[in-house]
C-alpha cells in the first residue's frame, strides 16, 4: 500500500492492537503515533507491535492530542495523500479491498479535504446511555450534554448524489478518513462520509463492543483533552 495510514494512540493499547490487526488483515502496515502513553498495558502492546513489525511506532515525548498528525512538523512531512484514524473503530466486514482508492476517488469527485467512514449509531448492538459534552457558541460559550444519537443524527441529513456510493456531507474529526492535501482550504472538518459497506462502528458507543475495562478507561480519560465523553 502506497498510502500511509496513521493511527493515533494514547493509553488505549487494546484498541490500537485491534486496529492494527484489522489493517494488517487488509495488507496494510500502519504508522502509530503514540502520544506519550503512560499506561503499562499500552506500552507493552506498543513494544510487541514494534517487535513483531506489525506497524511502525513513533513515540512522541509529549501528548499532542488526537490531532497529533496535523501538528506542523508532522503534517509537513506527510505525503499529498494519507489516511488517519483513531483506533477504536470496528471496520465493516464487507469493506471493499480497494477502499483506500475508492475514498481517494471520492475526495477527487467532491474536491474535499477528506472522505471517510460513516458511523451509524443504530445497529444490532445496544447504544450506550453515556453522554457527550457539546460546546456551542463562538462568542458566548455554551455547553450542554447530549446522547450519542442526538449528536450523530445531524450527520445523516445531507445525502450527496453519487453513481454507486451512499455518501453524506458531514464533518469528520479524527475517525477514519483518507486525506488529500490539495483540497484543503482552511476547513479541517471539510469532509464527506461514505456509508453502506464503508460504515464502521465506533466501538465505545456500544457496551457490547467496547474493549476498555473501567480501569483502562480511567487511564485513557486521564489527561485526555480530546475526548468529549463525560468523565464518569
Enumerate the predicted regions with their spans.
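A conserved hydrophobic helix/loop-capping motif in glycosyltransferases and polysaccharide synthases
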Residues: 3-15, 19, 33
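A glycosyltransferase accessory/donor-loop signature
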Residues: 168, 174-232
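Short, acidic, metal-binding catalytic loop of nucleotide-sugar glycosyltransferases
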Residues: 21-30
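Conserved catalytic core of nucleotide-sugar-dependent glycosyltransferases
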Residues: 65-68, 74-75, 90-190
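A conserved acidic beta->alpha catalytic loop
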Residues: 33-45
